[in-house]
Design a protein with these regions (language model features):
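A generic fold-level signal
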Residues: 5, 50, 69-70, 103
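Short linear motifs in intrinsically disordered
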Residues: 28-31, 77-78, 98-101
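Residues that cap or initiate secondary-structure elements
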Residues: 18, 46, 81-83, 127
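Vicinal oxygen chelate
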Residues: 1-15, 35, 61-128
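Core segments of cupin and vicinal oxygen chelate
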Residues: 2-5, 11-56, 91
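Short amphipathic beta-strand starts and helix->beta connectors
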Residues: 56-61, 94
């Protein structure tokens, strides 16, 4: 079974998300959108876009989306078959969170790594 197929997103908290987003936009050219992040469209070596994006987002330090992790970041990994991967991780003794989510954005599940970081696993909707 193929497990991780790519990075779907990088999410981190900031004490002053507005100022930090502005810094990234000014100094690194990140095209920060009103929702607080950017979507990097995938391209091949020739620069031709193809289906897939990597999300980059700065959130407020007080949000609890990363709970139970105490980390200031979370990485979202693309996976081919979320249900099969979560089952395999449970069988391997990993701390898989019970909650899953199925929305128009795809299927989501979470596992805690050995250092207490919450890892988001994302199965994109068909066609992505």
């Amino acid at each position: 079974m193929k497990r991780v197929t790519g990075i779907g997103g990088i999410f981190f908290k900031a004490k002053d998300p507005v100022a930090l987003r502005a810094w990234y936009q000014k100094h690194l050219g990140v095209n920060v959108q009103p929702w607080g992040g950017a979507a990097f469209v995938w391209a091949d070596d020739a620069g031709n876009a193809y289906k897939g994006t990597t999300i980059w987002n700065i959130g407020d330090a007080n949000n609890d989306y990363y709970a139970p992790s105490k980390s200031s970041f979370m990485i979202n990994y693309r996976v081919a078959d979320l249900a099969a991967l979560l089952k395999a991780l449970r069988e391997e003794g990993c701390q898989v969170l019970e909650k899953t989510d199925d929305s128009e954005y795809g299927k989501f599940g979470w596992v805690m790594d050995p250092e207490g970081n919450k890892v988001e696993l994302w199965q994109p909707p068909p066609g992505q």
